[in-house]
Amino acid sequence: MHYHIIGIAGAGMSAIAHILLDQGHTVSGSDVQRNALTEALEQRGALIHDGHDPAWIAGADALVATSAVRDDHVELSAARARGIPVLRRADLWREWSQQRRVVAVAGTHGKTTTTALIALMLTQAGGNPGFLIGGETPDLGIHARWGDPAAPLVVEADEYDRTFLALTPDVAVMTNVEWDHVDIYPSPDNYEAAFRLFTRRVAQPQRLIVCGDDPGALRVANHPDAQQYGIEEAIARNPASCRLAPMDWMAANVRYDGAMTNFDLWRYDRRTFGARLDGTYTMRLVGDHNVRNALAAIAVATLLGVERDAIADALAAYRGARRRFDIKGEANGITIIDDYAHHPTEARATLAAARARFPQRRLVVYLQPHTFSRTQALRDAWADAFDHADVVRIGDVYPARETGDPRTVAHALAGCIRHNDVQAVGNVVEAAATIGGLLRPGDVLLTLGAGDGYRVGELIIDTLRQQN
């Protein structure tokens, strides 16, 4: 079959394109701008069109569109006029879920890292798993693969537009649940209701892996047989949070040493009501949030029969996904890091990790807020998200699919943030010029956001290198 994909330059739709190519289908696609993801698809034989035009769907047997594509999109309208079936991401996920054993990683934060770790652990054990990951993962060489149909298909189960409800997981992870995608879910209760429905799609509750440190995850996965994971220190701070059962997978004695993290893993045996030390694990990721991501991946891989040595080797080797604490480079003694964090909780966790990694250095943070609806709804939560930063700069809002005034909303957000050095800095080019002028040797610049704010760091590092 010939599938034409609208929005093929995005992580989610390019992943679908790779799977379809693996299955032997013909793939074409269109987007407003090419990138490394479309280049990789072209190298595999996909036909990529610039911009959007009804002519691009010629010869297509089916059209695949992202949930964000408007109903009056020219290619979508042309497909319907010609009787070409229009599929959403959920339609393909549902079909694949019926063909494969699915491991689904759901949650507001941490999905990409956890999904990638599980896929890498299965691969390290000699398997050929399928996977769909929402970020480029150098250790796997690609962010989506069909793999061996007899092996599990590991899916980053995105909740946007309730797409994850198309899956019927054999194993599922719930990393955390905290209101997001406010354009789809008008209230926290509405958001949690979707996750509650997702947990019910797991046939056996003991194959549901839940973060016991997260109150939201515990609320939606309220089953005594669900396995829990968490960090000993977090449990000590909030013992009431662990109300389903003792921690089945618990990290203790977490140690950060520069770019490395070590922790001891304790496993609880529900049959003997006792815990045993499984050993010490090492990884190249920093931050408590990444310890939790690692615990979830270890739990899933163990459940799927992967030996401990393969799990430990994969965890130690994992270098992270692109745009997840992604060190872009260093120039003039200034380190520039980019992260996809676009929710206050994600930003807070990323800043804590940066402070642990660079305890003595000045931390300059640039945030490009993502969408007007999210920025407005979570404005109060942003107020205290920058406690670990020394300097905070807020860029214009990245509108994505929404309309509004990027600058006015950014200035309003900057005014709500409780910090003694916070300013709004305009668009990407203006932000790069302003921030570049205040950086000094020894600084760490951290760019945050799900849009194109990473360009601020790229522009600054190019300028610094030209000065040498």
UniProtKB/Swiss-Prot annotation:
It catalyses: UDP-N-acetyl-alpha-D-muramate + L-alanine + ATP = UDP-N-acetyl-alpha-D-muramoyl-L-alanine + ADP + phosphate + H(+). Keywords: ATP-binding, Cell cycle, Cell division, Cell shape, Cell wall biogenesis/degradation, Cytoplasm, Ligase, Nucleotide-binding, Peptidoglycan synthesis. ATP binds at residues 107-113. Pathway: Cell wall biogenesis; peptidoglycan biosynthesis. It is an enzyme of class 6 (ligase). Transmembrane segments: none annotated. GO terms for molecular function: ATP binding; UDP-N-acetylmuramate-L-alanine ligase activity. It holds the Pfam family Mur_ligase_M. GO terms for cellular component: cytoplasm. One of its GO terms (biological process) is peptidoglycan biosynthetic process. It comes from the Bacteria. Its EC number is 6.3.2.8. Its main location: cytoplasm. It is found in: Cytoplasm. The keyword Nucleus does not apply. Belongs to the MurCDEF family. PANTHER family: UDP-N-ACETYLMURAMATE--L-ALANINE LIGASE (PTHR43445:SF3), UDP-N-ACETYLMURAMATE--L-ALANINE LIGASE-RELATED (PTHR43445). Cell wall formation. This is UDP-N-acetylmuramate--L-alanine ligase. It comes from Roseiflexus sp. (strain RS-1). The lineage of its organism: Bacteria, Bacillati, Chloroflexota, Chloroflexia, Chloroflexales.
